[in-house]
């Protein structure tokens, strides 16, 4: 799938990995719809890139449908979905005062796993109704998991479960959508320069970066976007989760 003239719907596109992907798409001739809850940042970036912004809670069917509809209305189609929206918490299964709050666990799984699936099913439905390109492709879907899906740390039960679910559904969804000419892959980033990590003191950031075997630094959002581009452009990449982590394997804590 060529980036040029493809229409992108990017959840969590107002910042971090999603924003870098939106910039990559626009710089290479793609048309971008940023779907996010951050109206100010998302709207500003969309305007800068000549794209559109949709306020979108990925767990909402109505919001998801509206974001897809905006892409179809404004740009005449939808070829690429990149799921970057997500949340994280740190909470042990049994705390000092009480067991893990069930509502907080449910919220993380709902946003990260169910929210991703919600956007996949809605975007894929729109993609499947369009005509294929010369290679028979109708669309590409890129999800975001995490190395926590494999190396979940202490306090990451909810987050690891949610991202493990994203990894687990990648292959079956790719197989489901193969007859429609839609490819599905997932990126599992390691420790990256996201807004959350950049809020830490510089010493803490450097310490985290040194845990990465090579290169011994935090990953850059542009590197995530670079891999997303490779997935989109390579027709044979399908049904796979790719770790983007500098060979790190997370310690228990």
Residue ranges and their predicted role:
Residues 2-33:
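Canonical Rossmann dinucleotide-binding motif of NAD(H)/NADP(H)-dependent dehydrogenases/reductases
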Residues 87, 98-118, 142, 159, ...:
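Catalytic Tyr-X3-Lys loop
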Residues 88-106, 125, 129-135, 155-158, ...:
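Conserved mid-core segment of classical short-chain dehydrogenase/reductases
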Residues 110, 203-223:
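Catalytic Tyr-x(3-8)-Lys segment
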Residues 120, 162, 170:
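Active-site helix of classical SDR
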Residues 125, 174-176:
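Alpha-helical segment proximal to the catalytic Tyr-Lys
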Residues 146:
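Residue(s) in the substrate-gating loop at a strand-loop-helix junction
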């Amino acid at each position: 799938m060529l980036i040029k003239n493809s229409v992108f719907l990017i959840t969590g596109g107002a910042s971090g990995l999603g924003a870098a992907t939106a910039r990559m798409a626009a710089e290479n001739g793609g048309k971008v719809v940023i779907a996010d809850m951050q109206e100010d940042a998302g709207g500003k970036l969309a305007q800068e890139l000549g794209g559109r912004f949709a306020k979108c809670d990925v767990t909402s069917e109505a919001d998801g449908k509206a974001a897809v509809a905006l892409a179809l209305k404004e740009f005449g189609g939808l070829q690429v979905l990149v799921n970057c929206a997500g949340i994280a918490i740190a909470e042990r299964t049994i705390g000092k005062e009480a067991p893990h709050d069930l509502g907080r666990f449910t919220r993380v799984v709902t946003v990260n796993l169910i929210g991703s699936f919600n956007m996949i099913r809605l975007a894929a439905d729109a993609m499947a109704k369009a005509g294929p390109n010369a290679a028979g492709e109708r669309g590409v879907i890129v999800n975001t998991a995490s190395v926590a899906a494999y190396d979940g740390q202490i306090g990451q039960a909810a987050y690891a479960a949610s991202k493990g679910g994203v990894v687990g559904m990648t292959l079956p969804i790719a197989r489901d959508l193969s007859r429609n000419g839609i490819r599905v892959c997932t990126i599992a980033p390691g420790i990256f320069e996201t807004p959350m990590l950049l809020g830490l003191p510089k010493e803490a950031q450097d310490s985290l970066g040194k845990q990465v075997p090579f290169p011994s630094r935090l990953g850059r959002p542009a590197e995530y976007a670079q891999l997303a581009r490779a997935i989109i452009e390579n027709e044979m990449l399908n049904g796979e989760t790719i770790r983007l982590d500098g060979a790190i394997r997370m310690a228990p804590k």
